[in-house]
From Swiss-Prot:
Protein name: 3-(3-hydroxy-phenyl)propionate/3-hydroxycinnamic acid hydroxylase
EC primary class: oxidoreductase
InterPro entries for this protein: 3-HPP/3HCI_hydroxylase, FAD-bd, FAD/NAD-bd_sf, PheA/TfdB_FAD_monoxygenase
Binding residue positions for FAD: 17-46, 285-295
Gene Ontology molecular function, alphabetical: 3-(3-hydroxyphenyl)propionate hydroxylase activity; FAD binding
Keyword RNA-binding recorded: no
Amino acid sequence: MAIQHPDIQPAVNHSVQVAIAGAGPVGLMMANYLGQMGIDVLVVEKLDKLIDYPRAIGIDDEALRTMQSVGLVDNVLPHTTPWHAMRFLTPKGRCFADIQPMTDEFGWPRRNAFIQPQVDAVMLEGVSRFPNVRCLFSRELEAFSQQDDEVTLHLKTAEGLREIVKAQWLVACDGGASFVRRTLNVPFEGKTAPNQWIVVDIANDPLSTPHIYLCCDPVRPYVSAALPHAVRRFEFMVMPGETEEQLREPQNMRKLLSKVLPNPDNVELIRQRVYTHNARLAQRFRIDRVLLAGDAAHIMPVWQGQGYNSGMRDAFNLAWKLALVIQGKARDALLDTYQQERRDHAKAMIDLSVTAGNVLAPPKRWQGTLRDGVSWLLNYLPPVKRYFLEMRFKPMPQYYGGALVREGEAKHSPVGKMFIQPKVTLENGDVTLLDNAIGANFAVIGWGCNPLWGMSDEQIQQWRALSTRFIQVVPEVQIHTAQDNHDGVLRVGDTQGRLRSWFAQHNASLVVMRPDRFVAATAIPQTLGKTLNKLASVMTLTRPDADVSVEKVA
């Protein structure tokens, strides 16, 4: 219910297609993606500027692929440290688990350290590319209300002036204490950890050793992390009876740092801050014309670095669907698949993060003894040890329902999983990552075949209205065979041989890839038409009003 101010006339009225509450990483990613799709966006943020202190320190391959989708990855990479290993240590300093996955199936290193404020600044600068995106800081969201075809937001500026925003949709990216979620009375189920952790960031890294170390000390567990630009992060468990004020006192801070540094007096402190680790999940992600994303929808402990990355997955999943609905290319039932696809995986990442925290700081002493024993035993079980150290236990996003069409058993199907991103060779000889050849679009990718062959003229018209790219993959040595060219089809060479292996493994020759790079369906040329009809129905696509021209893609 909106708060009414009958005696105060609003200073400004805004009318937009999408209002985003919160200029954190998820809100800024949503704004960048929608901006490049031509959607009119307004971001409103309570603070007067971006948060400038480090928070998240881990960005994964999926999040970098999301940055790539909005043309910002080259600006983000200088603020990352790729291939960032995570090492678990016993109290005596023995490494019992060294997690350093070395695969790059999605085009980027799987584990990377990063400096969040600098990456957030890249995204804020990124929205300036789009005249249809505006960001308003120092705007407190006082109230909002939903009507059949719009959401009305009531804002207050730092000077006390009122503004009204009329939007078709509201995306709440306003954090774990989300005003939007609380106003809608959406349950935020889960637990708050009984213990807290104090985070200490130091400039001119006094250790300068690479990677991140988690020391499972039963007296006081701690974390030591090397970050880009010579920043060192330490995290110490706050013990019962201690307060943030006490730990901030110089003598107590010196005592903490003496645990990890030979000279705790010779440091350049950036900041200290106490955190409570929560594990909570919103019961619903969509409430009519309001959608929850990022921490507003789920929060999790930091131990797997997945809070930030889960928020990026939300933005990538939601943004393309919202754009299609606003453009009239799909009905709003498509937005129901956002919760259907994202909520279960967010829960899996919460559970994994809680488990990792329990490995670092077991709730009971005997659990620590068991952990140490199991870690020793793993040395005699190399396949099991590799399973953990290569992070194969990480729940890869897989959707079992939603905007996809699956034939056969789900367990072995690639449908609902992210498609690989190898390097490909273009016809002009350039070598690039696959997504760069596709852009922010759907793609129908065929191994060796003309992907248009199994489609009717009506289907070609429908999918071209979505800016779908049609890709023919051939062995690299065939890339200049002119007679195989087809109008409206982009030919690429399989530079690394990974696409051939993928299609051979999954017994398919055609894949329909969504804009968020997930496999929506697989087929062979003779079944593609039927599959596309099913997918169009599942996604509630509308029919294009006019013919879409077919042009030759060089």
